[in-house]
UniProtKB/Swiss-Prot annotation:
Involved in DNA repair and in homologous recombination. May regulate the cleavage reactions of the branch-structured DNA. Has a very weak ATPase activity that is not stimulated by DNA. Binds DNA but does not promote DNA strands exchange. GO terms for biological process: DNA recombination; DNA repair. Pfam families: Rad51. This is DNA repair and recombination protein RadB. SMART domains: AAA.
Amino acid sequence: MKTLSDISESVLIPTNSSLDKLLGGGIEKGCITQFYGPPGSGKTNIALKILYEATKNGSKAIYMDTEGGLSLERIQQIAGTDFGSISKNIYILEPKSFDEQILDIQNIEDILKKDKSIDMLIIDSIVALYRVEDGDPSEINKRLGRLMAKLLRLSREYNVAIVITNQIYSPFDSDDLIIEPIGGTVLKYWSKIIIEIEKSVDSLKRTATLQRHKTKAPGQSIKFEIIDRGII
């Protein structure tokens, strides 16, 4: 047991982009931050920008690519002359099934125990393999819930920031104007910070809207742009 005075303030990892205005300064350690949106909205670009910012000063990160879309060229473009140094600070995991994803996350704890310089875990995306899993939907949802509970425990116990990207869908009983993040209440429950990413008419502009935050009111939004060096 500890007293309130023993609890330290949250540590933030800046994204050095306009997203920091929504996030209160950056990605928070000790919790899960979720970015969700349609294909092509910029979720992976956000993830890679965060990856670069988390590792450029010598800290390490784990990047889990579940979609097979990790682009070395894009990371090089974002990192520029820092690529050589940050490449040594990034662990890459590429599970090919939901079972492999769960196993990899279980094994991440061993990595965190051995390497105390890891500050960030990014999963892009959290649901790609979950969506194609065969079996009883209720049981698969339970497994997703256990996976998320494991991630939250790791974030708190090892004081790492966890970022997940998520996809969207339109419920069958709604019109196309209503979209929901996949994973429903499971991902919403375990994600303490949630940001929706939307495309704009201008293909270079995106809108990020705060849907959930530990200390800030939802509904705030900012515009950002995808550029060679990530996002601004």
